[in-house]
Amino acid sequence: MPFVVIITGIPGVGKSTITKLALQRTRAKFKLINFGDLMFEEALKLKLVKHRDEMRKLPLEVQRELQMNAAKKIAEMAKNYPILLDTHATIKTPHGYLLGLPYEVIKILNPNFIVIIEATPSEILGRRLRDLKRDRDVETEEQIQRHQDLNRAAAITYAMHSNALIKIIENHEDKGLEEAVNELVKILDLAVKEYA
């Protein structure tokens, strides 16, 4: 039976670090897939874009088609090995927040778990300010908290349409990284019996 874990968190929460460390420790051999990368590869193949930043400017129906194609590929891959899908639950745009995974995509992916990585707004803000290599929007602590709240709401919506379990993992500055990695490993290890 396919085993798909969606992992999400706003920029600066430490999702990439936790994911990388957990994949090194889990007993299951997950395939890590970035949903946006898969969409971008398809768009390049179809000569729709040359750069990733152009993806946001594609017509909505084209973006939806790219999402559907990516979801179908992932569902097919999940028949052979467990998938850890790195994606955004919500995407902040100049006009508001966009759901990262529309209903049709969630139905195809049918995840087992939706994992949200969180930290306090002050921790996230501090990490963003220390990571000057990344081009990130400047947000207040209130805006960061709002984005995390919207991610929780999106995860509930996704779970309603897939029967996935939601797991919130906190990544705090004071020894939180190790605990966060261990919590994710426990979830990933559940896939071992599915692919034995």
Curated annotation (Swiss-Prot):
EC number per UniProt: 2.7.4.3
Record gene name: adkA
Xref: HAMAP family: Adenylate_kinase_AdkA
Sequence similarity: Belongs to the archaeal adenylate kinase family.
GO CC field: cytoplasm
Subcellular location: Cytoplasm
Protein name: Adenylate kinase
Residues binding ATP, per UniProt: 9-17
Recorded GO MF terms: adenylate kinase activity; ATP binding
